[in-house]
Amino acid sequence: MANVVVVGAQWGDEGKGKIVDWLSERADVIARFQGGHNAGHTLVIDGKVYKLSLLPSGIVRPGKLSVIGNGVVLDPWHLVQEIAKLRADGVEISPESLMIAENAVLILPLHGELDRARESQNSVAKIGTTGRGIGPAYEDKVGRRAIRVADLADEATLALRVDRLMVHHDALRRGLGIEPVDREALLAQLREIAPQVLPYAKPVWKVMNEMRKAGKRILFEGAQGALLDIDFGTYPYVTSSNVIAGQAATGTGIGPGAIGFVLGIVKAYTTRVGEGPFPAELQDADGERLGERGREFGTVTGRKRRCGWFDAVLVRQTCATSGVSGIALTKLDVLDGFETLKICVGYELDGERLDHLPIAADQQARCTPIFEELEGWSESTAGARSWADLPGAAVKYVRRIEELIQCPVALLSTSPERDDTILVTDPFED
């Protein structure tokens, strides 16, 4: 029995929510290990739609333990709102079903204010942040001045933490022309929210290791995608945390030996939200068609996603950096009806052919895609549950992707419904 890490292998929005939900039915523990409430995921269960952005996907399934690990930055007010919304939808949530790492860093109102002020004043090169304070919260974590969940339990400690934080933030705010932090108002907000958060606070590292020793199945749920990784993504147009599979261990306090299978979620084409390089991007009728058919709008922000053909170079790269064992290929049905499909198989930069994306941002921006054309199909793949249900051209497309990314397909998703899935390799089996 293997513990499974699910990571997005593109720029996020690959359909992780459905796959995680599909796997979570058989998992005992579902843990988030990085990010914040900036990455939304949509679940469709028995026709009912759930939109989550902070809580693990397993929260909607009774009898599962959902975990928010120390690698996550936590907005406590958003947490309470998301819990309330799910409860209104009939989902039962208690400290028995949800656990939050005591050492998880809090996102405060001042983080969102700083995030938005920087983005609005940075006219030269906007990063495309959601403005929710995730980046500034991670900055405070690395700067060793953050307020953590455990700090909410002691008022004296909390006051000291706020004072230390204000020294840094008030200086920043002066430079940006923002009013200083209202110390008493912030403390009052934290005191008010503390009783609603602390019941869920636990030593996650300890519980996770106990679960592992007891033979429980653990599913590690990543947010966003590996191309947004702070180290291996398209820097600086990235998120503020590590997104690749290795972060699952660091972000929950469990050893890397606990990871048995890494499942990379890959869309059958490519999308990106916000700024940054996108070599295979389409700015024509085909790109519009992909966006309309795939309903490519962000779960959290509602922003229209940029669309392009499948980029095998990037996915091969992310499969390597995350040690992907197999991929789940999603949204194949969006390609139904295209007469011709294209796959990016390399880049050209200054007259030289490359088999990887260079690390320098200026070089990334100058890369032009080298495409390989494949025959499309007119038949529908929507709802297919076996290889026999797929048109021959669709099977060839999938097989070509496997060859180019040097990684096998473990799952194939053919609609948002969780049961419309073709299983090739069971990630939970050793």
From Swiss-Prot:
Substrate binds at residues 299-305. CDD domains: AdSS. InterPro entries: Adenylosuccin_syn_GTP-bd, Adenylosuccin_syn_Lys_AS, Adenylosuccinate_synth_dom1, Adenylosuccinate_synth_dom2, Adenylosuccinate_synth_dom3, Adenylosuccinate_synthetase, P-loop_NTPase. Binds 1 Mg(2+) ion per subunit. IMP binds at residues 13-16, 38-41, 130, 144, 224, 239, 303. Keywords: Cytoplasm, GTP-binding, Ligase, Magnesium, Metal-binding, Nucleotide-binding, Purine biosynthesis. Pathway: Purine metabolism; AMP biosynthesis via de novo pathway; AMP from IMP: step 1/2. It catalyses: IMP + L-aspartate + GTP = N(6)-(1,2-dicarboxyethyl)-AMP + GDP + phosphate + 2 H(+). Mg(2+) binds at residues 13, 40. The keyword DNA-binding does not apply. Its EC number is 6.3.4.4. SMART domains: Adenylsucc_synt. The keyword Acyltransferase does not apply. It is found in: Cytoplasm. Disulfide bonds: none annotated. Its main location: cytoplasm. PROSITE patterns: ADENYLOSUCCIN_SYN_1, ADENYLOSUCCIN_SYN_2. Pfam families: Adenylsucc_synt. Gene3D superfamilies: Adenylosuccinate Synthetase, subunit A, domain 1, Adenylosuccinate Synthetase, subunit A, domain 2, Adenylosuccinate Synthetase, subunit A, domain 3. HAMAP family: Adenylosucc_synth. Homodimer. This is Adenylosuccinate synthetase. It comes from Cereibacter sphaeroides (strain KD131 / KCTC 12085).
